[in-house]
UniProtKB/Swiss-Prot annotation:
Keyword Cytoplasm found: no
InterPro entries membership: Bacteriocin_AS48, Circ_bacteriocin
Lineage: Bacteria, Bacillati, Bacillota, Bacilli, Lactobacillales
Covalent link Cyclopeptide (Leu-Trp), residues: L7-W76
Secreted among keywords: yes
Gene: ublA
Entry protein name: Bacteriocin uberolysin
Length: 76
């Protein structure tokens, strides 16, 4: 977790931006997953790694939100 915080600080990711991303995932996670699946199919698997990593991020954030840890999801 510390390395993620250091990386966020180094790259200049503001907590406001992170909160907006978490809110977007909270509201539209299913749409994000469907879009990533469609993009993988259309690209004949070329976007498979990107799709898998995006799905992992979405599932991790949704897991934090489901456990009422929205602030921790923003930090992550």
């Amino acid at each position: 977790m510390d390395i993620l915080l250091e990386l966020a600080g180094y790259t200049g990711i503001a907590s406001g931006t992170a909160k907006k991303v978490v809110d977007a995932i909270d509201k539209g996670a299913a749409a994000f997953v469907i879009i990533s699946i469609i993009s993988t199919v259309i690209s004949a698997g070329a976007l498979g790694a990107v799709s898998a990593s995006a799905d992992f991020i979405i599932l991790t954030v949704k897991n934090y939100i489901s456990r009422n840890l929205k602030a921790q999801a923003v930090i992550w």
